[in-house]
């Protein structure tokens, strides 16, 4: 029987990383970096900084989800790179834990600066809780914001993506997830709404194909999550998978998975890169799990869908001032790996009494297929739109993985239902006409609370619990 060699107790721990005989992780409310001896568990060094008010205003606090490692091919120099809660990128010597003096300002790059926008260094609501990614000599950093259902303002910080030199911390490139005037995609923001709209960060993990020198960016929704009247248009590159050049940040291709999102369908996890034989041909693919339980699969060189993605008509809502897209993308393969939308047939049916109660509760709400829009909540009904998967997915940041031996993609999915509605804000709460209303969750449905799903890339989707 295998015995436990040692146990280390750390509070608020991020994902651990083992490099040879050392373990690195983040821990604690200040996101300290900790280095451990992998054999004994001895703490070799720790590093943290006190960010004062800036850390207190940070939208993504605590330990975060981990850190990155870089090693020089020529000198063997090793660095640990991470982003603090206050949105500073730090490079530490992997052996000593000391800041790397040649990187930025004595080991620190202030990510609130040189960002092609004005960001208040103390109160600017932008940060990152996922890890930066190092590819060759480029460090790529995304951005995260506060949860966007109840924004204080229609104006917010933009979540641009940047690449930095791993040796010096110099900014190499920036990709504007909300295009500037004259850039591709700016025309998808009507009424000059690109000027003040924010968010569209990449808070999920980023993937890189080193051979193709291509970075795959899973982009979140724009301000606000459920009410988009102040940003009419399709809103590129919100809720899009974007491929950019590793060395320059220039867009190679993109595919928008949700037009003018009003459902908080951020792309929540790392794109999955795989080389797969499809119809007798070896294809380099990128597969993107989503909150809406669709697996979108593309040729990762060209961006062309491996199987057709149809633009299907969806219901247009009646929230005052809202702009609606008449269609939304629906993959034809693979099939959805979790429940989409809610109908009376989905309600709980363990006993006749529970079934009747489920129908009664559901009658207070609007029901329909995926992409049924939110409503203005009313005490006279409907209270909200029953949404499945809920705003947390489907799939969320744990994402999925590819098994090359069995040609399977495995994803974790949450089968929960939520009631989605908007309401006028309280005086002084927001300058938006409507924000998210969250009085109650949706009714229980049959089929359980979640599943692990697997998709054979040439066969139907299956679910395993």
Put a short name on every predicted segment.
Residues 3, 7, 158, 268:
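Short coil/loop residues immediately preceding or within conserved phosphate-binding loops
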Residues 33-57, 74, 89-123, 154, ...:
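Extracytoplasmic/lumenal domain signature
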């Amino acid at each position: 029987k295998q015995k436990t060699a040692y146990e280390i107790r750390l509070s608020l721990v991020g994902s651990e990383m083992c490099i040879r005989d050392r373990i690195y992780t983040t821990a604690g409310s200040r996101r300290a970096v900790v280095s451990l001896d992998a054999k004994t568990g001895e703490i070799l060094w720790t590093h943290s900084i006190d960010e004062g008010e800036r850390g207190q205003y940070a939208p993504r606090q605590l330990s975060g989800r981990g850190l990155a490692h870089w090693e020089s091919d020529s000198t063997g120099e090793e660095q640990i790179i991470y982003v603090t809660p206050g949105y500073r990128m730090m490079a530490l010597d992997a052996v000593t834990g000391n800041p790397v003096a040649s990187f930025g300002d004595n080991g620190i790059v202030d990510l609130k600066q040189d960002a092609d926008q004005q960001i208040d260094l103390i109160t600017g609501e932008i940060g990152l809780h996922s890890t930066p990614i190092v590819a060759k000599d480029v460090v790529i950093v995304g951005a995260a914001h506060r949860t966007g259902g109840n924004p204080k303002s229609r104006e917010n910080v933009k979540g641009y993506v940047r690449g930095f030199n791993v040796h010096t911390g110099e900014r190499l490139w920036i990709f504007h997830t909300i295009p500037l005037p004259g850039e591709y995609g700016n025309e998808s923001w009507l009424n000059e709404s690109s000027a003040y709209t924010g968010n569209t960060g990449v808070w999920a993990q980023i993937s890189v194909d080193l051979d193709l020198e291509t970075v795959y960016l899973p982009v979140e929704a724009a301000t606000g999550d459920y009410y988009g009247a102040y940003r009419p248009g399709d809103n590129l590159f919100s809720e899009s998978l974007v491929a950019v050049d590793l060395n320059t940040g220039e867009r190679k291709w993109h595919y928008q998975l949700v037009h003018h999102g009003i459902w908080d369908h951020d792309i929540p996890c790392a794109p999955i890169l795989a080389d797969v034989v499809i119809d007798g041909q070896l294809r380099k693919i990128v597969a993107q799990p989503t909150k809406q339980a669709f697996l979108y699969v593309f040729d990762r060189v060209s961006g062309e869908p491996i199987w057709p993605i149809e633009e299907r008509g969806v219901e247009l809502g009646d929230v005052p001032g809202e702009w609606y897209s008449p269609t939304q993308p629906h993959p034809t393969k693979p099939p959805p790996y979790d429940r989409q939308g809610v109908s009376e047939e989905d309600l709980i049916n363990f006993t006749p009494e529970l079934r009747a109660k489920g129908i009664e509760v559901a009658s207070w709400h609007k029901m329909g297929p995926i992409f049924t829009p939110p409503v203005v909540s009313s005490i006279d009904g409907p209270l909200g739109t029953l949404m499945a998967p809920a705003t947390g997915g489907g799939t969320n940041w744990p994402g999925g993985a590819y098994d090359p031996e069995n040609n399977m993609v495995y994803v974790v999915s949450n089968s929960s239902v939520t009631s989605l509605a908007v309401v006028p804000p309280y005086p002084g709460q927001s300058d938006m006409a409507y924000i998210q209303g969250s009085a109650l969750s949706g009714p229980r449905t049959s089929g359980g609370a979640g599943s692990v799903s697997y998709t054979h890339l040439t066969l139907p989707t299956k679910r395993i619990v």
